[in-house]
Amino acid sequence: MLARSIAAAVQGIDAIKVEIEVTVDWGSGFMVIGLPDIAVKESAERVRCAVQQAGYDFPGKKVMVNMSPADIKKEGSAYDLPLAVGILAGDEKINPDLLGRYMLMGELSLDGSLRPIKGALPMAILARELKLDGFILPRDNAMEAAVVNQLKILPADNLSQVVEFLNGTFELEPTVVDTRAEFAKAQGVFPFDFADVKGQENVKRAFEVACAGGHNILLVGSPGSGKSMMAKRLPSIMPPLTLSEALETTKIHSVAGKLPRGTTLMTTRPFRSPHHTISPVALVGGGSFPMPGEISLAHNGVLFLDELPEFNRSVLEVMRQPLEDRIISISRAKYSTEYPASFMLVASMNPCPCGYYGHPKKKCVCNEYQRTHYMSKISGPLLDRIDLQIEVQPVDFDQMSSKAPGEPSAAIRQRVIAARAIQELRFKDEPGIHCNAQMTPSLLHKYAEPNAAGLEKLRDAMERMNMSARAYDRILKVARTIADLEACADVLDHHIMEAIAYRNLDRPTYMGNGVY
């Protein structure tokens, strides 16, 4: 008998339909065709044991499984459940009437219990698009998939429950989540607050500008000056995720298997901080089993690279394209896929190997060659893509011992949200553009042209600091953001001056001006 079950395969962060056809006929053997990987081929023994442990006889005949479309590679053990159900239906142990109305995905253990899978959210979205009656999956993935409205999410604990449900002798209780209530519940809950930061008002201002416009920022300062501490508080002043951004962010983490158990929807912007020993593949994604990398896991959030020069140069250089395009395209011999990568890059570094160049009290022990070599680990093209380059000075004793709290994150966040609202209105007819950092050259000409005095100051700075055309664009974008924070329709000369002041590493007097 021929039986069909419906499953899904993840490509990028979306799912595509996979139809599993099973025939049980005279003969012997178990064969899976349709471009399965090793894990799918190995499922034969897992499925056999799980079926027997569930109390059913595995057919003593020839089992032929075809997974279509045949040109899409089927990876992982999540196909165990649809394979097992298809085999039992082909052996006439399951009523086939309901089988084509539900998507089934889940890994089987040898005792027949269901284990969690990756990518449940995009699969649930696909099931809704296919107008199926529901999605049967492991219980650990139920809350994640239940974010999708207008689809019945049916969690199961083991194979027996699924078989009995399809035969009409057992009811699977649907999992229901109020997506909007879950989304609103956790808004504004952050573990860190800028009120804890003493002093550093210029750095806080730079962070405010960066968040208001979605700009990349680099902090350069001695050890203990508070670079990492302030960077960790950045999500607390970023604008809240929209519902569509939250869904997209959750999809990426679902595909990567990074969602904590029981999570429904990611309601705060991600903050990713990889170690400097990370490989290029781990950063941008890919591998033999394509997975999102750190830059995609930071999508709609922050990618924090602490001690930037300690990262391998090849790792840093692969970020150049996604920093511009906000998407990462991965092409290999056997596949090609894309992952979103619209993140805010926040990096920190010491000014020299010993860390104390420019320190007001401690003496630097590095020579000029060591300092220049240290800075040269960051290429000019990468540095050009960082809009704000800020020197962080150590906090003096009076500020450190002050009992007065700093400005709370909530107050800064309100100004950031107001500036973002101006940008949303400005770019409402520009597809894919949501903030000033994403402006194209034509939009810069339209919205960020400075007044005559500002243009003259920009010309003088460009000539003195020998800045590139990309740096010119970045200054205009930052100046536009500063104007938005003041609710000013025009970009004025003092906006340009403040934006230029954030290009610290471009100064001729800075020892890092030889970065290449």
Where would I find each of the regions flagged by the language model?
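Peripheral, non-AAA+ core regions of ATP-driven protein-machinery
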Residues: M1-L218, S222-S225, S331, A471-Y472, ...
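Short beta-strand elements
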Residues: V18-V24, L283, D387-I390
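Basic, amphipathic alpha-helical bundle interface domains used for macromolecular binding and assembly
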Residues: I33, A39-A44, P59, N66-G76, ...
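Residues immediately C-terminal
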Residues: L110, L303-F304, E310-F311, F397
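P-loop NTPase nucleotide-binding/switch module
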Residues: F170-V209, G213, P240-I295
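Walker A/P-loop
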Residues: L219-P260, D325
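Walker B catalytic acidic pair
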Residues: N300, D306-E307, V318
